[in-house]
Amino acid sequence: PHPPTPAINTLYLSSAASDVYKRQNSATTATIGSMMHPEMVKGGYDERFAAATAASGGVVGIIIPPSIIFIVYGFLLNLPISDLFVGGIIPGALMVIGMMVACWIVCSMNGWGHLISLSLNRVTKTAFGSWLGFFAIGLVLWGIYTGKFSPTEAAGVTVGFCMIVGLISLPLYRMLGFEGNEDKPVQDKSYAEMALVEGFTVTEIPSIVIRSAQITGILAPMIAVSVVMQQILSLLGAKETIEAFVTGMGGYYAVLFTAMAIVFVAGMVLESLPNTIILAPILAPIAHSIGVDPVHFAVIFLVGGSIGFITPPYGLNLYVASGVTGVPYFRLLRYTVPYLMSLIFVWLLVALVPELSTILLPNR
């Protein structure tokens, strides 16, 4: 016997790993969703549930370090980025586990995923074939956490590493006779074949740069508009209004949960980046004034913001998943409910147990 959800568990783990270097939830949903959705449908999953799963898989992107939103938050609030990265490790893992459990319950109740089976040979070869990707991730984390280079420098080092590996791998791939075996089943490939990536040629670099620029270009106008919007809200007295409303709630938990409610509602209509730029400078000082640890509140804030990616009426990941899977937006909405419930449970747990965000921090 085997669990009914190995394909979806694979989606969540690959989404979490992909988010580490993409650092953009919608990009992860598009990439992983387009690859995994057809396989999940073939494996006996309902297409609407598979699409909703692809959308929810990208949610953890802003929590799993290194995250660009943590960098923005740290810059806005003058907090150590390395501390924020460490603070997101356990909550990010809990989010992934929570969605896996929700998925397992739903699939068990509906009998989905019965055609998917686990193979130790396939799992070990796939894990072995991922070593270069995990090495790149480890290089980023090692460099940032040891202070060898800044997050910006880490990005440059990683790009350089991937470029070198990609350019070297293709000649080796061809020389060893592996070219043309891309569609060969994993279990039939040798470990040597799995250890190499297909790579690319120098002529493909311009298209890679263009694709990267397209993704990066999404952020610039969002930041510009968010900064202007923040200034407009400031001129209109929104900052003082929100501060007065939140602080007027009274006790510790009343203030904390009011701030969380504001973040949650804003996350329904705003992307995480403008949400952070606009609300973090307003709510963080209030949270600090009632005794909430700065790193703890940062994690609370960003976990709440991440839930907005699959929360209507905006739910950016829902639109992306609908686009890449062909499942109409309104048909996949109700299948996100189990994931929303699990994420909200984890969010409340993180808010009520500060140690989940701070236990790995030094000198705490």
Give each language-model segment a name.
Residues 15-364:
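Alpha-helical transmembrane segments of multi-pass membrane transport proteins
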Residues 1-17, 21:
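Single conserved hydrophobic/aromatic residue that forms the stacking wall/gate
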